[in-house]
Each structure stands twice: as C-alpha cells, then as structure tokens.
C-alpha cells in the first residue's frame, strides 16, 4: 500500500460523510417542494381527512381476529355477610368447637384439627375481612383513627444509680397522658408515685436525676395499689372495657418490656396483657424521618421535638412532663398523616423472621456466646435483661397489626380452652383462687408483724463506665443487632394440686442468675427479703399519690386489688377493640 492510498478506516469515514450529505440534500429538496405547493383550503383539508377515515373504515378484520367488547365484571364479594363477620370477631373467644367449624364451613375452609387450630384458622380469615370492612366504612379517615380512639402516653421514672449496668430498676413514678385521637388533643392526665421495695432508700444520683424526694416515695403507695389507681382513672374513660380501642405510646421499648415486666415480677403478679403490646414512637419516628440525631447531648424526646419544630415543655426526667411531650410528638405526627400503630410487643416466643433475614441469622449464630466484657455497657445491660426476663421483646409488622395476629397469646390458650372441660377448668380456677387468698393473707400477716422495713443499698460497680443521662443512650437498635443472639426461655406454668404445698413467690435469684449474674450481684440480692415479706400497701398513706385529672369527678379506690390484677386472663385472639378488661 502506497502512502497516497487511503486506509480502510479512511474509506469508511468518507463513505459515512457521503451518506450524510445525500440525506441532507434530499431533506432540502423535500422542503423546497412543499414551499412551492399552494396552501390547501379548509374544504380540501376536510375532504382529505374524510377520505382517510373512509379508507380506514373500509379495512375488513377477519372474524376470528375480532375481539368482542368486554362486559363489566363485578368485584368479588365476601362469602359471608358483614354482620356475621362482626359477630364472629366479637364472640371468637367464647365460640365452641362446633361453632368454629360452622364459621369455617361458611368460607369453605377445612374444619379439621383441634379447637386451638380451628380458632386460629377462623381468626386468620375473619380478621382480614374485618379490616377491609373498617377501611370501606371510613375510607378518608385519619390512619391512626381507624384503629384507636385514644392513646395513652407513658414514661416511667425508676430507681437508679450513676452506673446503670445490671441494676434492678423499680418504678417510682407512674404517669399517664390521655390523647383523644379524633380531636388530636390531650384530654386528661394522671400521676402517682410508687414506694420502692428492693431499694427503698433512693440514691443521691436518683434524687438529683428525677427530682423526686425521699419523703415523696416514703409516703407513696406500693406498686399494686398504684396500678389499681391507674386502672380506676382509665375506667372513667371506659378504657380497658369491652369494645374500647386504645394503645400505650412509649419513647423506646424499655418502659413496658423491661421496667413494667420486672416490676410485675417483683410484685408477684402476671404482667397485664394490655401492657404487652405498645407503640414505640421512637421506632416509628426513625422510619418516617430517616433516623434520629445522636450524640448532641439531647435526649431522644428533645431531638424528636426539635425535628417537628416543637419545644420541650416542663422539667426533664419528670415522668409526667416527659409523657406530656411524648403526647405532643404523637399529636404532631398524626397531624402529618403519619400512621401510629402497634409496632412492638412482649411475648414468650419470638416472632418468625422473614426468609430474607435467615442468612443474616446464620451469620449471627456464632455471636451467641459473645464476651460481654468487650461490648458497650448499655448493650451489655440490654443483653443481660433479654436473657433474664421471660417475656421477650419482638417487632410487630404492619401485616401482623392489620390482621391482629400480634394479639395471639399462647400463654392463655390452655386456660381458655378448658372451659368446655368443666372439671379441668374448675380445678384450675380453684387453684388460682387459693393462691390469691393465701397471698393476700401472707401480705396482711407480714405487714401486721413487721411493718415498714429497710433494705441495704446495692453496691455500685466501679469497673463500668459511668452514664450521666440514661435517656441519651439510644439502644433502640439493640433489638435488631442482638435480637437473634439471645436464647429463648420457654416459660411453662406449673400449678400444683390444692392439697400440696403452694408457693406464690417468684424465685428472683433464679431470674437474676440467668446468663450473667455474678457472685457479688447475687450476694446483694440475697440480702433482700422474699416477696412474702413485702409490706401491704394498706400501710401506706392515702395522701401519697399526686394525681392530675382534668375531669371533675373525684377518685375513689375501693376495688379489690388482687381480684383486679389476678383475674383469669382472656384469650386475646379477638379484635383489638376487645382489649382485655380489668
């Protein structure tokens, strides 16, 4: 090839230029031809369009290729009437096995299995139908108002020391703020202080932190009576009664899962079912606002208020003031059309994980025996309590909330299902009544003999890093990070025959020794009296409660505390509108 001959690449480039030039010339010629033609009149344009339409109409489509016009298809209707759905939801707990089979036959579903299986099968279908009916009745209603009429914001204050690791907190302030969901405003407030038993003398740090004086808790009622006063206040608004729709709102999971559960263990009562599911507003806030600011020296409540352009009202670490600010956050989020729903619960069994997280769980299996000394102090504390407390913290998905699957309670099924077996049911009721009566007599006897007693303080731990403000420690992510590491503890209630020796106290040493109790910690616990030695709340002053109720009706406490707190629990498979009454 000589130097004057073009290369193959040059030939291709020249050919492309010739093609572009040809296209450009043809385009210019077409424009020039259109400019030379005279403009058509409106009649000519209309006639041209008519010819085009006629030519299109003249096209014959083969019959086998023609599509018939579709007819309007009515949407599928429910197999059962709405009234029957409502009836099943209301009576699900008390329906016999034959009635459950009839309900399943109406929807053409298998009727095999025992009563427990039948009830769950009925609940699975009729809950979905009930949720759809509620949405049809109020399609434009506020999201939260579809599920609740009232919300109760709570924030407990507890005994504490400067070092919070592995410390047995006791509730010393029990506040509640009632929110009308439809009106989106606070309508009532309640507060009572509580006398601690395991650590009756408050530490200097606790008094400075909570601004609660020693004299205040000394004159306060014990937890059982304080809880009864909360119930009495709630009854004024028909909360806890049949068909009442309400939920508790907390700033984090610890108020219900840790503080309330451990306080019930100390008081030797079963944790009431209405406290076992709640709205963790911090969790909802993080999901809707892409997280929460940390490390700025402010509590989670303050950061949420600041993000919503609100200001903190009252004193920090005051239970009632914190609950009032939580209520303000909830109201503002409802005004922004953010759905507030049950998103966490306490249960004996962990909720089933989705298949997408199974690989992650396998990776965390090796971390189950993690060395707690190498973990941050707040996470160590969280892990220890997750192992010790019988009710585990778990999340509630939106599907589980809408279908009300989160209300399923395996711990009460046996008691409820025995109602058809009259002999077995009467035996259990007799044992329960005996336990209640014996417990009441023991409390009264010890109170008459010993009166008020003092318990030594638990020693401080000098090896841990001090925590100045526990509200600043955000361990909300602990559930997600460490939830799969904790060993499940199956709790089985064993009720001995009436004639045998009965013990009503909780073995706190066994609870304390569960995965992590050191010898020094157990020595401190051994100095505390058993639950039989708790003085009766009747010895406390009736003026110890500071209550703030906007309603004018006075508060009378004349109900039997044991009957209220230890009543046979209902199976909670029914609608959330039928919350367990007290």
Curated annotation (Swiss-Prot):
Signal sequence region: none
Record-level Gene Ontology MF annotations: 3'-5'-RNA exonuclease activity; nucleic acid binding; RNA binding
EC annotation from Swiss-Prot or TrEMBL: 3.1.-.-
Its main localization is: cytoplasm
- Ranges where the SAP domain occurs: 92-126
Which cell locations does it reside in?
Answer: Cytoplasm
Q: Which SUPFAM superfamilies match?
A: Ribonuclease H-like (SSF53098)
Can you give the residue ranges of the Exonuclease domain?
A: 151-330
Q: What class of enzyme is it?
A: hydrolase
> What Pfam families does its record include?
RNase_T, SAP
For this record, the Gene Ontology CC terms, alphabetical, are: cytoplasm
Sequence ranges of Basic and acidic residues compositional bias? 34-61, 515-524
The residue ranges flagged as biased composition, category Low complexity, are 529-548, 572-582
Q: Where is this region: Disordered?
A: 27-61, 515-582
**Which Gene Ontology terms describe the biological processes this protein takes part in?**
exonucleolytic trimming to generate mature 3'-end of 5.8S rRNA from tricistronic rRNA transcript (SSU-rRNA, 5.8S rRNA, LSU-rRNA); germ cell development; meiotic chromosome segregation; multicellular organismal reproductive process; negative regulation of post-transcriptional gene silencing by regulatory ncRNA; regulatory ncRNA-mediated post-transcriptional gene silencing; RNA catabolic process
Q: In which tissues is it expressed?
A: Expressed in the somatic developing gonads and in a subset of neurons. In adults, it is specifically expressed in neurons and in spermatheca.
Keyword terms of this UniProt record? Cytoplasm, Exonuclease, Hydrolase, Nuclease, RNA-binding, RNA-mediated gene silencing
Q: What biological function has been recorded for the protein in this entry? A: RNA exonuclease that acts as a negative regulator of RNA interference (RNAi). Probably acts by degrading the 3'-overhangs of short interfering RNAs (siRNAs). Component of the ERI/DICER complex which is involved in processing amplified double-stranded RNA (dsRNA) intermediates during small-RNA-mediated gene-silencing or RNA interference (RNAi).
SUBUNIT field: Component of the ERI/DICER complex at least composed of dcr-1, rrf-3 and eri-1.
Q: What is this protein called?
A: 3'-5' exonuclease eri-1
> Which species is listed as the source?
Caenorhabditis elegans
User: In the UniProt record, what gene is named as encoding this protein?
Assistant: eri-1
């Amino acid at each position: 090839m000589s130097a004057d001959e073009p290369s193959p690449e040059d030939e291709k480039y020249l050919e492309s230029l010739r093609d572009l030039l040809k296209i450009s010339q043809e385009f210019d010629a077409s424009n020039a031809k259109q400019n030379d033609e005279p403009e058509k009149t409106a009649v000519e344009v209309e006639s041209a369009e008519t010819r085009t339409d006629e030519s299109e109409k003249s096209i014959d489509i083969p019959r086998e290729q023609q599509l018939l016009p579709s007819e309007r298809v009515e949407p599928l209707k429910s197999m059962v009437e709405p009234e029957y759905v409502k009836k099943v939801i209301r009576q699900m707990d008390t329906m016999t096995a034959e009635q459950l089979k009839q309900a399943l036959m109406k929807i053409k579903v298998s009727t095999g299995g025992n009563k427990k299986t039948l009830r769950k099968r009925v609940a699975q279908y009729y809950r979905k139908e009930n949720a759809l009916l509620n949405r049809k009745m109020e399609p434009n209603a506020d999201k939260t108002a579809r599920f609740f009429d009232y919300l109760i914001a709570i924030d407990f204050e507890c005994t504490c020391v400067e070092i919070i690791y592995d410390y047995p907190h006791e509730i010393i302030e029990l506040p509640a703020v009632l929110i009308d969901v439809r009106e989106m405003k606070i309508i009532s407030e309640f507060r009572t202080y509580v006398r601690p038993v395991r650590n009756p003398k408050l530490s200097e740090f606790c008094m400075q932190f909570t601004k609660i004086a020693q004299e205040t808790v000394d004159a306060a009622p014990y937890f059982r009576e304080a809880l009864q006063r909360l119930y009495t206040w709630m009854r004024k608004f028909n909360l806890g009664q049949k068909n009442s729709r309400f939920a508790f709102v907390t700033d984090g999971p610890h108020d219900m899962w840790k503080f309330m559960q451990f306080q019930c263990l100390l008081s030797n009562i079963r944790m009431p079912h209405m406290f076992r599911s709640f709205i963790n507003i911090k969790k909802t806030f993080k999901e809707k606002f892409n997280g929460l600011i940390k490390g700025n020296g402010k509590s989670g409540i303050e950061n949420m208020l600041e993000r919503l352009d609100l200001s903190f009202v009252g004193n920090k670490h005051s239970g009632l003031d914190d609950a009032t600010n939580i209520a303000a956050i909830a109201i503002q989020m409802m005004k922004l059309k953010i759905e507030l729903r049950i998103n966490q619960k306490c249960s004996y069994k962990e909720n089933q994980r989705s298949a997408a997280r199974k690989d992650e769980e396998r990776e965390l299996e090796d971390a189950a025996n993690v060395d707690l000394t190498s973990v941050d102090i707040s996470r160590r504390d969280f892990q220890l309590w997750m192992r010790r407390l019988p009710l585990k913290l778990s999340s509630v998905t939106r599907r589980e909330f809408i279908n009300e699957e989160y209300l399923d309670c395996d711990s009460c099924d046996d008691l409820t299902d025995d109602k058809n077996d009259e002999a077995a049911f009467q035996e259990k009721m007799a044992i329960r009544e005996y336990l209640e009566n014996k417990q009441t007599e023991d409390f009264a006897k010890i109170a008459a003999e010993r009166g008020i007693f003092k318990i030594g303080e638990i020693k401080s731990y000098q090896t841990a890093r001090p925590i100045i403000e526990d509200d600043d420690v955000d361990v909300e992510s602990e559930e997600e990070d460490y939830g799969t590491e904790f060993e499940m503890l199956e709790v089985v209630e064993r009720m001995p025959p009436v004639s045998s020796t009965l013990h009503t106290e909780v073995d706190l040493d066994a609870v304390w020794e569960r995965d992590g109790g050191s010898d020094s910690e157990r020595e401190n616990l051994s100095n505390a009296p058993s639950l039989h030695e708790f003085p009766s709340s009747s010895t406390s002053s009736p003026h110890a409660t500071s209550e703030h109720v906007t309603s004018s009706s006075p508060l009378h406490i004349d109900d039997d505390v044991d009957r209220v707190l230890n009543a046979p629990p209902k199976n909670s498979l029914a609608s959330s509108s039928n919350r367990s009454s007290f």
